[in-house]
C-alpha cells in the first residue's frame, strides 16, 4: 500500500535540508550533486553513493535474491505479487545498507536509492532492454509499477524503506546504438496515451521518490534537460516533489551527441535550470564555472540540492538509530529462506503456456528416458537477464529436471548447438552436435528443447559478450542453429516440448506448427530451473499471460526508429499476431458466465464489471480475469486492457469477480494529448484474453461482451 506522508515530518525535512545546504560552500554543494557524493566532515555529512540497482532484486552488490527478470514478472499479471517483490527488494536493500555502513562501506550499489523500476513501454520486440520493463501496455505497466514502488518504499509515514526511481523518463525504447544522439519524435496523442501514463501513475499514485531522465531527446529536447518533461509536466502538472537524476553520463551527450549545447558548462546549466537535481557522472563539476558565468544561479543549485537532502532525510540518514524503524533490519534478511520461497513462488507464477496438444503435463511414472537438448538447458546466464544480482545457488533447467526426476527417470543431455555462433569448438564443423541431438532423441521418450536468448543477445548498448555490438536484436528469429536443432528433434518423431528462455518475443512459427507444446519461461531467476520442471511435470499449473505481442516476423513491424504507435503493439496492430498480448493457456479450463455492469454509463466514479469464473477442469488453477475497452467509432485503438484481477480456483469451484473501471478507462487522447471521454458506445470485454480473433481461436472461447453508452462528451484532467 502507498505510504501516507506525515505532513509535520515533511515540513521538518524541508527545513532541515535547506538549513544544511545553506551551510555549504558552492564547491561543497556541487560535489553533493554527483552520484558519488563525498563526505563533508565539518557538517557531519557521510559520503553517499546514489547509484543502486534493483529491477528484479538488488543488483551488482554481492549475494542477493535474484528474482525473474521484470518482463517475466509482468507475465504473472499479478499486482499483489509485484508488491511482495518490491518489498523484498526494499528489505534486502536495507539489510545490505545497514550491514555495509557498519563496516564503513559506502560504495556504489550498496545504498538505499534504488534505480528501479524501468517503466518504459516495450513498443518494439527488437529493443534490447525491453526485458527490463513490464511489457508493451501502459495500463499493465502502470499497475505493476505502482505496486512495485509501494512495496519497495514501505508504509511508514515518517521514513522510506528505500527510495524507488521511475526510469527512463519518458519516451525511450531504442535503438540502443543511437541513444546518445537519437531524437524520438512523438505526437502529443501518443505521448499522453502511451508513453506518459505509467510515469504519471507512479508519481501521483505511488509517490515514487525519484525519476530518472533518459539518454535520448524527445521532440528535440534532451530528456535530462527537457523543460517540457521535467518542469512543465513532472514538476508543474504532476506536482512531483521528489528528486530527478540523469541517466549515467547522459548530460555529456547534450554537447557530444545531441549537439544542443556548445560544451559542458552550457550542458550542466541546461540540466539544472530545468530541474535535473543529480548527475550520474561527473559533469556537474562544471557548475561552479556555470555560476561564475551567470548561466545558472546558486539559488537553482540550492533548490536541487535541498530536494536531494530531503530524500536522504526521508531515508533516515540524519536521524538517530532508534528513530528509524528500518535501521533494525539485519543482514539476515538477505537471501533468507523466506526470500528463496518467494522467489520460487514468483518463478512458478511467470510460466506462460503458449501451445499444448495434451503432451503437458508430463507424467514421470510413464517415462524411462527424457532428452534435454539446447544451449539454454544448462545455462545460468539464461536464467538472469541484465542488472542481476548474485544468487547463492542457481538451478538451470537441466538441473531442475534432473532434481525433479531423481533416479526414477534417466535424463540424456546435449547442448545441441552454440546459442548463436556457427559452432561450439572453433575447429569443428558447423553445427557439430546435430548427430548427438539425433542420438539423444532416439533414446528418449520425450524431448525437451531449451532454446531462446540470453542477456548477451539482448541488453543495453555495449553489453560485454554481445556479438551484435549493441543491445538490440537484429530480427525475431531464433539465433544461430537453434531452429535446425529443433527440427532435428521434431523429425525424430518423439514428442517435443519447447521451453523458451528470453526476455522478448521471437517469431517461433516453425515451433508453433510442429512442437507438441511451448512453454515461455522468460528469464526465470535463480530458481528458474525448479519452476520450469514443476510446470512441465504438473507440480504447478502455468498461469502466465503474455505482456508483449509475439509477431510472425519483424516484417510485421514499422521501422524501429519510428516512435508513432500506428501498427505497433496489440493496441494498434492491424495484422494477426502469432501469440497475442494477454494470451496464455492452463492445464485446466476456466468458464466465464453472468458478466454484468453496475451501470450502463460510466459516471464520475466509473462503474464495476462482475463475472462468475468456474474451474471446469480436473486440476487447480489460477486465471487472469482481463477487462478490455473499445471505443466503437472510427480511428480509435483496438480493445485496450483496463482492468485485471487474479483468481484461484479448485476443480469445480466458482467465484464471482468484480473489477472497477474508472471513468478514465473510457478516455482517449485527442491531438493535443487531452484525455476525452466521447459520447457514444463502448464495448467492454471480460474474460481470459483479448477479444481478437486469434486469441479466441487459441483460447477456444471468446470473452463476454458488454456495452456502455456515454451520453455526453467530457474532457478529463489527468
Which residue ranges define each predicted feature?
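Short beta-strand elements
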Residues: 693-717
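Short proline/glycine-enriched turn/loop segments at secondary-structure junctions
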Residues: 672-675, 695
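Glycoside hydrolase catalytic-domain context in secreted enzymes
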Residues: 1-670, 678-686, 690, 717-718
